[in-house]
Design a protein with these regions (language model features):
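Glycine/proline-rich loop-helix segments at beta-alpha junctions forming the active-site rim
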Residues: 87, 93-129
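A short mixed-secondary-structure module that forms the rim of ligand-binding clefts
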Residues: 51-73
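Catalytic metal-binding/acid-base residues of hydrolase active sites
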Residues: 49, 83, 125
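Short connector loops at secondary-structure junctions
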Residues: 75-91
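Short, conserved, surface-exposed binding loops centered on an aromatic residue
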Residues: 35-37, 70-71, 109-112
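Short acidic (Asp/Glu) patches
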Residues: 30, 59-66, 97-106
Length: 129
């Protein structure tokens, strides 16, 4: 995703390199990646919509994703979402004029190609799509 309407941010979080790709207004997060072992397999999660996790800090959901990836001996994980709109409440996300985000399909496909395994984890609210 090398476009001028995205912002890519990096951070070293403990043993993990972290990268987040946002829209230029940062109301959308297209992907969040953590890598702690470049040689190991990579796990891709597709979830509902981003909450508060950033390149610097996990939210509770992303923390669970990281723990699962580490427990299953993956060396990295990436989170993409069926809606890129950042909100802690799925009901509010549904009120957004454009909850998917212009570059979200590209981010999901990129994540599927990047990961060795993809987990669909968007729950019941995904029927809104």
């Amino acid at each position: 995703m090398k476009r001028k309407n995205v912002v890519t941010k990096y951070h070293q979080k403990g043993d993990a390199k972290s990268k987040a790709i946002y829209s230029d207004c940062e109301k959308y997060r297209y992907s969040l990646t953590r890598i702690w072992n470049e040689e190991a397999k990579k796990l891709h999660f597709i979830m509902l919509n981003p909450s508060t996790a950033t390149e610097i800090q996990n939210d509770p959901t992303v923390e669970r994703c990281e723990r699962r990836a580490r427990t299953l001996n993956f060396g990295a994980f990436r989170v993409t979402n069926i809606f890129a709109w950042r909100d802690t409440d799925p009901k509010k996300m549904k009120c957004a004029i454009e909850p998917i985000g212009l570059l979200n399909d590209e981010a999901i496909l990129s994540g599927c190609n990047w990961g060795d395994c993809t987990i669909a984890a968007w729950g019941n609210h995904g029927i809104y799509l």
